[in-house]
Amino acid sequence: MTASPVRHVPVLGREAVAMLAPRAGGVYVDATFGAGGYSRAILAVADTRVIGIDRDRSAIAGGFALVEESGGRLTLVEDRFSNLAAVCAAEGADVVDGIVMDVGVSSMQLDEADRGFSFRLDGPLDMRMSGHGPTAADVVARASETDLANIIYIFGEERRSRAVARAIVAARRDAPVATTRALADIVSKVVRAKPHEIHPATRTFQALRIFVNEELDELIAALAAAERVLRPGGRLAVVSFHSLEDRIVKNFFALRGKTGGGSRHRPEIERAAPSFAILTRRPVTAGQEEVSANPRARSAKLRAAERTAAPATADDGESPGWPSLANVMRGG
């Protein structure tokens, strides 16, 4: 007999699913399956089909019980959510009725010391969501001081990024920086803790995690893919947890929610009509009750929009000119 799956309560889950307004017979995508909280909620609302995507193999394995419980209405695919258009096509769903994305690291990943995401748990400095590609330890060992400083400043918004990078380079001359505790100790000597503020290593760990997993590039590509696969009237709901992610989502909806030329970064983009109607003029945030139950919800923001009948924007979702994982690892 299969064990009953753990009931995971997703951040802003009720609000996100309400934005999707699932209907019987609809096809929905949980683009960041994780512990399956959004998928479970969508399946419970109506007789829907859900395609769950996650690049973390352990998340997919953990979702098999929900697949069985759903009676075949849930399909799980191990892949990056930037590939959601190809995943949907492979599953026979050229268009879908709704997509939910919960961006960033999951609580499950943070709680596993051997995944190397948390400065609070000692473990190998890994941080990979998929288990493939360079680890955070590889980046720390091989990136130049300038690249490290740029990574930490851009993706972590750490004001002392240059000092942190300098300290990392000095430390690695003596011994490899191979564990989360070793890195946290290095950063804590440079970024001093202040009462009632975040841990000194928070921003550096965030930066390396985002960089190793190319999270912002993934988000940009996933949003563009969602625009292509949503049917008119289909809805996209995105939950983000820090300002970099939220800014990307906000700008995407703002750009797609108007006509005319593109942004100053992409002036060549022209739209005869908006491809999205924005449902959340201001982001939805968690209430005090949810924050008390789950402190991670404090920083969460939900934005949602409804697909119009206008053609998808001729935009490939190119990223801004921030540091590239491939270039940094080859010394470029």
Swiss-Prot record:
Primary localization: cytoplasm
Catalyzed reactions per annotation: cytidine(1402) in 16S rRNA + S-adenosyl-L-methionine = N(4)-methylcytidine(1402) in 16S rRNA + S-adenosyl-L-homocysteine + H(+)
Keywords on record: Cytoplasm, Methyltransferase, rRNA processing, S-adenosyl-L-methionine, Transferase
Aminoacyl-tRNA synthetase as UniProt keyword: no
Record: residues binding S-adenosyl-L-methionine: G36, G37, Y38, D54, F81, D102, Q109
Top-rank taxon, per record: Bacteria
Ranges for region Disordered: 284-332
EC number: 2.1.1.199
Enzyme class: transferase
Signal peptide limits: none
Record keyword Repressor present: no
Pfam families: Methyltransf_5
GO terms for biological process, alphabetical: rRNA base methylation
One term under GO cellular component: cytoplasm
InterPro entries tied to this protein: RsmH, SAM-dep_MeTrfase_MraW_recog, SAM-dependent_MTases_sf
Localisation: Cytoplasm
A GO molecular function held by the record: rRNA (cytosine-N4-)-methyltransferase activity
Sequence similarity: Belongs to the methyltransferase superfamily. RsmH family.
Function noted in UniProt: Specifically methylates the N4 position of cytidine in position 1402 (C1402) of 16S rRNA.
NCBIfam families xrefs: 16S rRNA (cytosine(1402)-N(4))-methyltransferase RsmH
Descriptive protein name: Ribosomal RNA small subunit methyltransferase H
Native source species: Nitrobacter hamburgensis (strain DSM 10229 / NCIMB 13809 / X14)
